[in-house]
Amino acid sequence: MATAMAASAAERAVLEEEFRWLLHAEVHAVLRQLQDILKEASLRFTLPGPSTEGPAKQENFILGSCGTDQVKGTLTLQGDALSQADVNLKMPRNNQLLHLAFREDKQWKLQQIQDARNHVSQAIYLLANRDESYQFKTGAEVLKLMDAVMLQLTRARSRLTTPATLTLPEIAASGLTRMFAPTLPSDLLVNVYINLNKLCLTVYQLHALQPTSTKNFRPAGGAVLHSPGAMFEWGSQRLEVSHVHKVECVIPWLNDALVYFTVSLQLCQQLKDKIAVFSSYWSSRPF
């Protein structure tokens, strides 16, 4: 019995020594690795900082779709804003070519990119507050930090992977409709959003429902992409979507950012799992 107790005490002493090493050395090694990865992610978002000089560079992207050639054009991205748009729309009814372009004095902020960037910045801030000189005293303290960092990274990723669901009146009321010169025709709506690593542009063509129409008017709810036949009320008019044209372009640095988020989340989870292994040995006391 005494031998077994001594062996148990020795095993516990070894585990406690390993756990102290985990808290004092390995945790900080993981935090350094996380900071390095997230700083790379922040560079993709062109985070403003004291070393940043001048505006973010402009990047031109050609819009395309495998299913239609009704819409062609380019979008110019400058950091988290669309600075230019040059779009040609072939109208289905008469094949007339309609040219849409942003006003020169306007930029359209992409809130998804801005929010994702802010969440990355917050994650970096949380990690920087626990520098090499900080001594973690318990596993619970590490878990709390990892949970906070993972929350910011999950939110950053979600902003890029989950576009907002908007109703057609919300799209019609958006400031994006006032970005164009000449003004958008009243029978067109335009929406722009990020989906994963793609910048998507959707053009909705509308027609008015006559008061004598026998169609059962049923306003559409919110959606990322509305379908032909979707109805809504705008002002004194009832309108229906007749055609939908969606084109997109791949933004390579968004793909990089998503990869960095995934790798960082995996590192956080691996550290949490290591803490959990030790906690299972002495779950009856704080760890």
Curated annotation (Swiss-Prot):
Chief localization: nucleus
Keyword Acetylation attributed: yes
Residues where N-acetylalanine is found: 2
Free-text tissue specificity from the UniProt record: Detected in brain, kidney and testis.
Pfam families: Rogdi_lz (PF10259)
UniProt entry keywords in alphabetical sequence: Acetylation, Cell projection, Cytoplasmic vesicle, Nucleus, Synapse
Segments forming a coiled coil: none
Transmembrane segments: none
GO cellular component, one term: hippocampal mossy fiber to CA3 synapse
Subcellular location per the Swiss-Prot or TrEMBL entry: Nucleus envelope; Presynapse; Cell projection, Axon; Perikaryon
UniProt keyword Signal, yes or no: no
A biological process from GO: brain development
Subunit: Monomer.
Record family assignment: Belongs to the rogdi family.
Protein name, UniProt field: Protein rogdi homolog
